[in-house]
Amino acid sequence: EKKIIASKAVSCLQEGYVIFLDISTINLEVAKIIFEKNIPLTIVTNMIDIMQLYRQESKVRLIFLGGDFNQARDGFVGTLTNSLIKNYRFDLSFIGVVGIDLQHNTISTYETNDGLTKKEIITASKQAYMVGESAKLNQDGNYIFASLDDFTGYICEKTLDDNTIQILKKHHIELK
């Protein structure tokens, strides 16, 4: 499932883009595909696993943002990370989500600092896509960081039911 989502995400990219990959296992898969295809673009990330992937030579320019280390998330979040993000304007970002509550129009994650960092990434992005398995629909995390209206689109592994598609379209969400 994660690899299907990652492949769809990579199909949105263009050479020369500046993108943000936040802390997400799907985004690690996105980074692997970009690395394998050697797509010339700039990745900005706060995820350690993505940084480690790019230790080898590549056409990708990698910018790693530090901050407060969150062991549970395997990356950096918080005030310092957020202040660094504010210095960028990303062509596109892929944001991992824990929950997409269609009824209440909320997008959530587990931790406050992670959510605040995701919010800054969205603000700094020309286009922001939620990436997550369809099982994340109508799930909840502990911290709401956005609404559907904050996103350009949603990338998942399968075709969704008509009711879900209608709700997402009402919020102008592109489906991939």
Question: Where in this protein do the model-derived segments appear?
Answer:
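Conserved phosphate- and dinucleotide-binding cores of soluble alpha/beta proteins
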Residues: 51-176
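N-terminal active-site beta-alpha-beta segment that forms phosphate/nucleotide-binding
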Residues: 1-88
